[in-house]
């Protein structure tokens, strides 16, 4: 499964919608017309199609209602929360012993006179 960040794309759309809603409520910008609700509807439809693309497990050829898309998004978020809540796997079992120079083969041990060449 490929990890994607759906937050940025939909966040921008939500911010855009929020700014438009505030402008309409304050009476700034365009006068309310039939064009404004259609563009909001297009933005929402774009967000739903984007969610549908980003959430794994949504079949490509099937029609889903907006409620079904949101339910799958919620299920996916809950699944991610469960995975993140699980403890991280620890180091593999077994003793971690430091290697002693006596255990190394003579070729791997650097003598004191050869160490001076390193620095």
UniProtKB/Swiss-Prot annotation:
The post-translation modification note in this UniProt entry reads:
Polyubiquitinated; which is favored by Ifi204 and leads to proteasomal degradation.
CDD domains assigned to the protein according to its UniProt record, in alphabetical order: bHLH_dnHLH_ID3
| UniProt keyword terms in alphabetical order | Biological rhythms, Cytoplasm, Developmental protein, Myogenesis, Nucleus, Repressor, Transcription, Transcription regulation, Ubl conjugation
**Expression by tissue:** Expressed by myoblasts (at protein level).
The subcellular location is:
Nucleus; Cytoplasm
Up-regulation conditions: By a variety of mitogenic agents in serum starved cells. Expressed in a circadian manner in the suprachiasmatic nucleus (SCN) of the brain and heart with peak levels between CT16 and CT20 in SCN and between CT8 and CT12 in the heart.
Repressor in keyword set: yes
**A Pfam family it matches:** HLH
Tell me which Gene Ontology terms the entry assigns under biological process. Answer: cellular response to leptomycin B; central nervous system development; circadian rhythm; epithelial cell differentiation; heart development; metanephros development; muscle organ development; negative regulation of DNA-templated transcription
Residue numbers spanned by region Interaction with IFI204: 35-87
State the GO CC annotations.
cytoplasm; nucleus
Name the InterPro entries for this protein.
bHLH_dom (IPR011598), DNA-bd_prot-inh (IPR026052), HLH_DNA-bd_sf (IPR036638)
Q: SMART domains this protein is in?
A: HLH (SM00353)
Q: What Gene Ontology molecular function terms does this protein carry?
A: bHLH transcription factor binding; leptomycin B binding; protein dimerization activity; protein domain specific binding; transcription regulator inhibitor activity
What does the UniProt function comment say about this protein?
Transcriptional regulator (lacking a basic DNA binding domain) which negatively regulates the basic helix-loop-helix (bHLH) transcription factors by forming heterodimers and inhibiting their DNA binding and transcriptional activity. Implicated in regulating a variety of cellular processes, including cellular growth, senescence, differentiation, apoptosis, angiogenesis, and neoplastic transformation. Involved in myogenesis by inhibiting skeletal muscle and cardiac myocyte differentiation and promoting muscle precursor cells proliferation.
Describe, as the record does, how this protein assembles with itself and its partners.
Homodimer, and heterodimer with other HLH proteins. Interacts with CLOCK and BMAL1. Interacts with COPS5 and COPS7A. Interacts with IFI204. Interacts with GATA4 and NKX2-5. Interacts with ANKRD2; both proteins cooperate in myoblast differentiation.
What is the name of the protein in this document? DNA-binding protein inhibitor ID-3
């Amino acid at each position: 499964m490929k990890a994607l960040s759906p937050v940025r794309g939909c966040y921008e759309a939500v911010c855009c919608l929020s700014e438009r809603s505030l402008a309409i409520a304050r009476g700034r910008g365009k006068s309310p017309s039939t064009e404004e609700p259609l563009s909001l509807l297009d933005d929402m439809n774009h967000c739903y199609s984007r969610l549908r693309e980003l959430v794994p497990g949504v079949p490509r050829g099937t029609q889903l209602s907006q409620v079904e898309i949101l339910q799958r998004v919620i299920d996916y978020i809950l699944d991610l929360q469960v995975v993140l809540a699980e403890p991280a796997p620890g180091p593999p079992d077994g003793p971690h012993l430091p290697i002693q120079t006596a255990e190394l083969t003579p070729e791997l041990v650097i003598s004191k006179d050869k160490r001076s060449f390193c620095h």
